[in-house]
Swiss-Prot record:
InterPro entries: MinE, MinE_sf. One of its GO terms (biological process) is cell division. This is Cell division topological specificity factor. The keyword Zinc does not apply. Keywords: Cell cycle, Cell division. Pfam families: MinE (PF03776). Belongs to the MinE family. It comes from Aliivibrio fischeri (strain ATCC 700601 / ES114). Gene3D superfamilies: Cell division topological specificity factor MinE. Prevents the cell division inhibition by proteins MinC and MinD at internal division sites while permitting inhibition at polar sites. This ensures cell division at the proper site by restricting the formation of a division septum at the midpoint of the long axis of the cell. The keyword Ubl conjugation does not apply.
């Protein structure tokens, strides 16, 4: 039976794995200026991808851009996923 178990996917805490993967901070080197116009579309695209795997409230996803230094901005993505018991 070990051979069959090899091909069977392992069950893991998928909400926790997704939460870890989606708590992303991306440092982006760029010139100073106003927030990029792509942020709303980025949030919408992220919601579409997350919705394929778990039901999530759009208000629970935030995307922000913070100017840290003159030439360093931080793009922060926070997604609060529902507990596994909620679905």
């Amino acid at each position: 039976m070990a051979l069959l178990e090899f091909f069977r996917p392992q069950k893991k805490a998928t909400a926790n794995i997704a939460k870890e993967r989606l708590q992303i901070i991306v440092a982006e080197r760029r010139n100073g200026g106003p927030a990029p116009s792509y942020l709303p579309q980025l949030k919408e695209d992220i919601l579409k991808v997350i919705s394929k795997y778990v039901e999530v409230n759009p208000d629970m996803v935030t995307v922000s851009l913070e100017q840290k230094e003159e030439d360093l901005s931080v793009l922060e993505l926070n997604v609060t996923l529902p507990d596994e018991d909620d679905h």
